[in-house]
């Protein structure tokens, strides 16, 4: 990999002037110059190709902590410059879908910084909306110039999924009754989404954002309690707030189960495209997320089974429901274990412990003192002992409870 400065400094203007572009007005004071940004470029690419440089800059930002509005402004200004040059030369239609995707992604990412800048709520919302509108317009213009593109569709999905909580849900209360149906936006995002092999990391990011959106939807109205520091057990016990049917989030809450199912299906499709050797980190993250979703699916039948199994009601219907919920939960937890096992990382004990805890769940679901239960608990103990040794006693309490 060779590090080299980008060609962002081809702008010959005074730094303190402002330019107006399709992205709105951004001060040049916040825009990097060529000598101030370095990116790593692969040795087998044309380092003088400006699109290659732009891709390198975006990838540098994408792989970073993403705390630099400065770099994002640099990406947007470089996109503006390339667009102006292409327009002068009559070559706009030669700009690739990758160019338009990077432009749109940078605009949508800027909304995160804008959300924390403006104190006037109305003005802030208008500014955020403008950036999202410009990002979606860039996708549409890209498709107009380049034709149908899975990558641009994926970026559209990302922009919409990011927009729902940041622009819309953040301004709502449990008593809101606006005419906006947010579920329509969610369905639109799903319609555009596809596991594009052109950028598998972006695919995972979009799905992770969708998971976050579902979590926000599920806990809507409990934001203050969660912010005050509930532990994971208390958070799981929070009852969903009953929203009015006219509430913008109501339909999203009604569709949580189907959306979690969709999310899991897309993650499984993504995992099928990942080579464990070539995409190790992404492979482990995806497998882990799938396993966690299976565990979430298992919560309801597990609760039903444990409730019925230790209930005094011995009716035939109760016995039937007990067995059905047990079988359903066992299957889901076993599926979770299969994926969490794939997500294990050799030098990360936390991943071993996560598999162990799933085996404990599995053991709890088997008939008491059965050979299957003992086998599940023994597997959990072996993994936890290994993880506990590696972490100098981090899992002492869980191990102690397991041995009782």
From Swiss-Prot:
Keywords: Nucleus, Transcription, Transcription regulation, Translation regulation. The keyword Nucleus applies. It is found in: Nucleus. Residues 1-34 are annotated as: Disordered. One of its GO terms (cellular component) is nucleus. InterPro entries: Nro1/ETT1 (IPR024318). One of its GO terms (biological process) is regulation of translation. The keyword Kinase does not apply. Its main location: nucleus. Pfam families: Nro1. Belongs to the ETT1 family. Required for correct translation termination and probably involved in regulation of hypoxic gene expression. This is Enhancer of translation termination 1. It comes from Candida glabrata (strain ATCC 2001 / BCRC 20586 / JCM 3761 / NBRC 0622 / NRRL Y-65 / CBS 138) (Yeast).
């Amino acid at each position: 990999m060779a590090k080299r400065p980008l060609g962002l400094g081809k702008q010959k203007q005074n730094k303190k002037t402002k330019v107006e572009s399709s992205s709105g007005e951004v001060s040049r004071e916040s825009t990097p110059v060529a000598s101030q940004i370095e990116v790593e470029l692969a040795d087998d690419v044309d380092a003088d190709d400006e699109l290659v440089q732009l891709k390198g800059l975006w990838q540098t930002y994408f792989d970073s902590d993403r705390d630099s509005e400065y770099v994002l402004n640099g990406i947007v200004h470089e996109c503006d410059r390339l667009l102006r040059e292409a327009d002068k030369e009559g070559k706009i239609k030669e700009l690739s879908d990758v160019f338009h995707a990077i432009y749109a992604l940078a605009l949508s990412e800027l909304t995160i910084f804008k959300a924390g800048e403006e104190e006037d709520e109305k003005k802030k919302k208008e500014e955020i909306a403008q950036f999202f509108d410009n990002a979606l317009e860039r996708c549409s213009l890209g498709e107009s110039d380049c034709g149908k593109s899975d990558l641009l569709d994926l970026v559209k999905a990302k922009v919409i999924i990011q927009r729902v909580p940041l622009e819309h849900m953040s301004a709502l209360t449990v008593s809101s009754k606006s005419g906006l149906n947010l579920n329509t936006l969610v369905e639109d995002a799903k319609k555009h989404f596809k596991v594009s092999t052109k950028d598998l990391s972006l695919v995972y990011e979009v799905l992770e954002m969708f998971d976050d959106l579902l979590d926000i939807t599920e806990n809507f109205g409990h934001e203050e309690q969660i912010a005050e520091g509930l532990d994971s057990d208390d958070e799981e016990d929070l009852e969903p707030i009953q929203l009015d049917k006219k509430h913008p989030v109501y339909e999203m809450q009604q569709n949580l189960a189907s959306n979690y199912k969709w999310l899991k299906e897309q993650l499984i499709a993504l995992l099928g495209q990942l080579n464990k050797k070539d995409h190790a980190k992404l492979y482990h993250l995806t497998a882990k997320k799938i396993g966690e979703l299976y565990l979430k699916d298992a919560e309801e039948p597990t609760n039903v089974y444990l409730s019925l199994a230790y209930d005094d009601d011995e009716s035939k219907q109760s016995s039937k429901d007990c067995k059905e919920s047990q079988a359903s939960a066992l299957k889901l937890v076993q599926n979770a274990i299969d994926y969490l096992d794939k997500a294990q990382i050799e030098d990360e004990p936390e991943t071993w412990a996560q598999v162990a805890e799933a085996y404990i769940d599995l053991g709890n679901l088997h008939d008491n003192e059965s050979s299957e239960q003992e086998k599940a608990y023994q597997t959990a103990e072996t993994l936890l002992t290994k993880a506990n040794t590696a972490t100098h006693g981090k899992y002492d309490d869980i191990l102690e409870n397991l041995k009782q």
